């Protein structure tokens, strides 16, 4: 059985940076926590907890020590509280996420209504909205929602960093019919685009696709959706234990990709498991 492993599988720059900062901070500070999970990988979060980094869900529950700002960023209101309490900050926000925050803020300051392409309940999206400080922001997940947008004199478009370029492009096309003036900032992470394009190519060749990563990871879920559109025999797994032998009946070529927050050791376990089945 042939195995095609995506070159782009695993940690992206932002996740690698965030985890390195977190492990270094664990050595530096006696009392340290992260506001929400640093990345969307339960396995990595568990390893960080073993190093003494507790995940705290509410900023109000942090009254001393150091706090790590997760890779997805936090809200402006949460950051205000952290500053007010004079907590030490380890900022692990992905630079691409910060760029999306800055563009959304700039657009609102210049009088644009912002169309944010993304998932309304995702922490990254909630963070981006908050930095506009009450500006008009419409969160749209797909073309259907974009069709319902009201007309506005000026529209500015930004995207959650893990969105597909195709989705951004289609929504932008609809927005062109909603306003006389439209500004578009492609805030999709470069690594996301590379990963998605590579997944498409592999899915065209493979008889079965395995997409490895946290079930709570937006970019991994999107990878699975992209692969599923091309290769219906696509399975999203978080760990090697979830792989079932019955999936591989009649399969000659297996494609494997992984989300941006999937550690290498989990990918290696999946590759080893599939290799063992072909012996």
Swiss-Prot record:
Sites where the protein binds [4Fe-4S] cluster: 12, 94, 189
Cofactor note: Binds 1 [4Fe-4S] cluster per subunit.
One example of a Gene Ontology biological process annotation: dimethylallyl diphosphate biosynthetic process
Residues the record marks as active site: 124 (proton donor)
Catalytic activity field: isopentenyl diphosphate + 2 oxidized [2Fe-2S]-[ferredoxin] + H2O = (2E)-4-hydroxy-3-methylbut-2-enyl diphosphate + 2 reduced [2Fe-2S]-[ferredoxin] + 2 H(+); dimethylallyl diphosphate + 2 oxidized [2Fe-2S]-[ferredoxin] + H2O = (2E)-4-hydroxy-3-methylbut-2-enyl diphosphate + 2 reduced [2Fe-2S]-[ferredoxin] + 2 H(+)
Positions contributing to (2E)-4-hydroxy-3-methylbut-2-enyl diphosphate binding: 40, 72, 122, 161, 217, 219, 261
Provenance organism: Syntrophotalea carbinolica (strain DSM 2380 / NBRC 103641 / GraBd1) (Pelobacter carbinolicus)
The protein's Enzyme Commission number: 1.17.7.4
GO function terms (MF aspect): 4 iron, 4 sulfur cluster binding; 4-hydroxy-3-methylbut-2-enyl diphosphate reductase activity; metal ion binding
HAMAP family: IspH
Keyword match Acyltransferase: no
Residue numbers binding dimethylallyl diphosphate: 40, 72, 122, 217, 219, 261
Protein name: 4-hydroxy-3-methylbut-2-enyl diphosphate reductase
Listed cofactors: [4Fe-4S] cluster
Organism lineage string: Bacteria, Pseudomonadati, Thermodesulfobacteriota, Desulfuromonadia, Desulfuromonadales
Gene3D superfamilies per the UniProt record, alphabetical: 3.40.50.11270, 4-hydroxy-3-methylbut-2-enyl diphosphate reductase, catalytic domain
Domain of life per record: Bacteria
Broadest EC class assigned to this enzyme: oxidoreductase
Cross-referenced InterPro entries: LytB/IspH (IPR003451)
Keywords: 4Fe-4S, Iron, Iron-sulfur, Isoprene biosynthesis, Metal-binding, Oxidoreductase
Pathway: Isoprenoid biosynthesis; dimethylallyl diphosphate biosynthesis; dimethylallyl diphosphate from (2E)-4-hydroxy-3-methylbutenyl diphosphate: step 1/1; Isoprenoid biosynthesis; isopentenyl diphosphate biosynthesis via DXP pathway; isopentenyl diphosphate from 1-deoxy-D-xylulose 5-phosphate: step 6/6
């Amino acid at each position: 059985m042939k195995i095609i492993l995506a070159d782009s599988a695993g940690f992206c720059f932002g996740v690698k940076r965030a985890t390195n900062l977190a492990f270094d901070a664990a050595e530096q500070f006696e009392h340290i926590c992260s506001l929400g999970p640093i990345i969307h990988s339960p396995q990595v979060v568990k390893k960080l907890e073993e190093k003494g980094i507790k995940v705290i869900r509410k900023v109000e529950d942090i009254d001393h020590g150091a706090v790590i700002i997760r890779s997805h960023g936090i809200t402006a209101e949460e950051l205000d509280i952290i500053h007010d309490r004079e907590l030490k900050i380890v900022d692990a926000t992905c630079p691409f996420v910060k760029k999306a925050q800055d563009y959304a803020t700039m657009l609102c300051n210049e009088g644009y209504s912002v169309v944010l392409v993304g998932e309304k309940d995702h922490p990254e999206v909630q963070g981006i909205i908050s930095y506009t400080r009450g500006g008009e922001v419409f969160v749209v997940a797909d073309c259907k929602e974009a069709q319902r947008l009201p007309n506005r004199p000026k529209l500015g478009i930004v995207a959650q960093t893990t969105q597909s370029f195709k989705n951004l492009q289609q929504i932008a096309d609809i927005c062109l019919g909603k306003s006389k003036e439209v500004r578009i900032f492609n805030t999709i992470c470069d690594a996301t685009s590379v990963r998605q394009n590579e997944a498409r190519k592999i899915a065209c060749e493979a008889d079965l696709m395995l997409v490895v990563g946290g079930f709570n990871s937006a970019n991994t879920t999107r990878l699975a959706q992209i692969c599923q559109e091309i290769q219906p025999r696509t399975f999203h797994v978080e760990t090697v234990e979830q792989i079932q032998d019955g999936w591989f009946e009649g399969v000659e070529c297996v494609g494997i990709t992984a989300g941006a927050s999937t550690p290498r050791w989990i990918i290696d376990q999946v590759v080893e498991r599939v290799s063992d089945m072909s012996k």
